Amino acid sequence: MQHLKTKYLDLPDARLAYCEQGEGPYLVLLHGNSESKRIFSKYQQEDFKGFTTLALDSRGHGETQSDDDELTIEKFSEDVIEFCHRKGIQKAFVIGYSDGGNIALFLARKAPDLFPRLVAISPNTLASGTEPGTLRLFQNLQRMMLFLKRLGFNTKKYLMRLDLMLTDIGLTGDDLNSIQASVKIIYAEKDMIKEEHIRYIADQIPGASLDKIADCNHMNV
């Protein structure tokens, strides 16, 4: 499997890094928190050959360059929309994993004509939708990073990423109910997102389909 070349596209306040592969309808791939576009390299080369795949690095992740004091899922979604506009893309499918799934929910609401069909893997709209043990882990990591910051270490990027997992993303039930795009939600049998929360999201989105994958967890769904 070859190492896909990183390309860049300039936005007004960021330089988005991405890998492009294949030919066919556009398929945008969105990674999770503290990951990068590289998690999709194998799929781009082996599984999605019938598509022009575009795996993006979100702000504060991978090789994307930006100077931010805060990261938000909504801002990530705005970057994806602007990216597609600047690439001249009029229609694209989306697969988003974890935080990428959260981005996909925003895209479904904001731009259903541009993104008519989306797959959101293990999304959550509320921080409280995370299993309590995992949420405590994130909170402990945040305290550790704040302690290291006081000692003079540069933990800004880590703290911004942790804030994403400890903050509601900003989509209400009414927002989800207004989604017009076709949305499929996938989650793991042993997911770190509460099953009742994922079912709540699916129930709020008109016509959304929901699949649970057996014998896997959030990290290998």
Regions from the language model: what does each represent?
Residues 14-63:
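Conserved HGGG/HGGXW glycine-rich cap/lid loop of the alpha/beta-hydrolase fold
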Residues 33, 92, 96-101:
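Conserved alpha/beta-hydrolase "nucleophile elbow" surrounding the catalytic nucleophile
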Residues 54-93:
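Active-site loop/oxyanion-hole signature of alpha/beta-hydrolase fold enzymes
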Residues 102-110, 118-145:
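Flexible "cap/lid" loop of the alpha/beta hydrolase fold
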Residues 148-174, 190:
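Hydrophobic, aromatic-rich cap/lid helix
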Residues 179, 185-187:
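Short beta-strand/loop motif that positions the catalytic acidic residue
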Residues 192-197:
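Conserved alpha/beta-hydrolase "acid-adjacent" motif
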Residues 216-221:
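Catalytic histidine-centered segment of alpha/beta-hydrolase-like enzymes
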